[in-house]
A protein has these predicted regions:
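Extreme N-terminal starter segment of soluble prokaryotic enzymes
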Residues: 1-5
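Short polar catalytic/cofactor-binding loops
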Residues: 7-12
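Cys-nucleophile CN-hydrolase/nitrilase-fold catalytic domain and related Cys-dependent amidase chemistry
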Residues: 15-16, 23-100, 106, 173-193
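Short, acidic/polar
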Residues: 17-26, 149-156
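His/acidic metal-ligating clusters that form di-metal
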Residues: 29-30, 158-164
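Active-site catalytic loop in hydrolytic enzyme cores
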Residues: 56, 85-160, 173-186, 190
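His/Asp/Glu-enriched short active-site or ligand-binding loop at hydrolase and phosphoryl-transfer sites
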Residues: 164-174, 197
């Protein structure tokens, strides 16, 4: 399986502008069908603390866009979005869509970046998720600050069917790129598995 990761220069809190950028990227890239397209954490809005005003229900605008993108490219698509759930605050989610445009599943970020007040605006998730793709490939998503918690990755590896690949979507700041690279490498080495980030 080919993986295409898009480092999007996000237009702040402008979903339509960001959808357009993603469309332009897939037009230029022409991904091979059956591949995995990976978009950043909160790709449609940026890492905004305006979660209450940006949240969407399941099957909202951003999920609909991801489903359409998956169908149009015949690829798996993973992207981050702000989702309304039956909780006090919305969640920061990674959503996985299959090439037919159907939801495979979602993961809610378990470790909010509280130094940036994320925990005040987003509800933390509480379950590690692992999804099976075509050919039996198992994928486990995490989001941004989760990367700093190796125990999450070990728990995923201890599940009945451990993942073959971790995908970490993020809005990681440039000033900590060195940390990002080293942490991705560490999670791969510790778990003897592939990591995309």
């Amino acid at each position: 399986m080919n993986v295409y990761a898009y480092q999007l220069d996000i237009v702040w809190e402008d979903k339509e502008a960001n959808f357009k950028k993603v469309r332009e990227w897939t037009s230029r890239t022409e991904p091979q069908s059956g591949s995995l397209l990976v978009l950043p954490e909160l790709f449609a809005t940026g890492f905004s603390m305006g979660a209450q005003s940006l949240q969407e229900p399941e099957d909202g605008l951003t999920e609909s866009f991801l489903k359409e993108l998956a169908r149009d490219t015949a690829c798996y698509v993973m992207g981050g979005l702000v989702v309304t759930r039956s909780r006090e605050k919305p969640t920061n989610d990674a959503l996985l869509i299959n090439p037919e445009g159907n939801r495979v599943g979602h993961y809610s970020k378990m470790q909010p970046f509280n130094m940036g007040k994320e925990g005040e605006n987003y509800e933390a998730g509480n379950d590690i998720q692992c999804f099976e793709l075509s050919g039996g490939l198992r994928l486990c998503p995490f989001i941004c600050y989760d990367l700093r918690f190796p125990e999450l990755f070990r728990k995923a590896m201890m599940m009945g069917n451990p993942p073959h690949i971790f995908v970490v979507i993020a809005s990681w700041p440039n000033m900590r790129t060195h940390h990002w690279t080293k942490l991705l490498e560490a999670r791969a080495i510790e778990n003897l598995t592939y990591v995309v980030g």
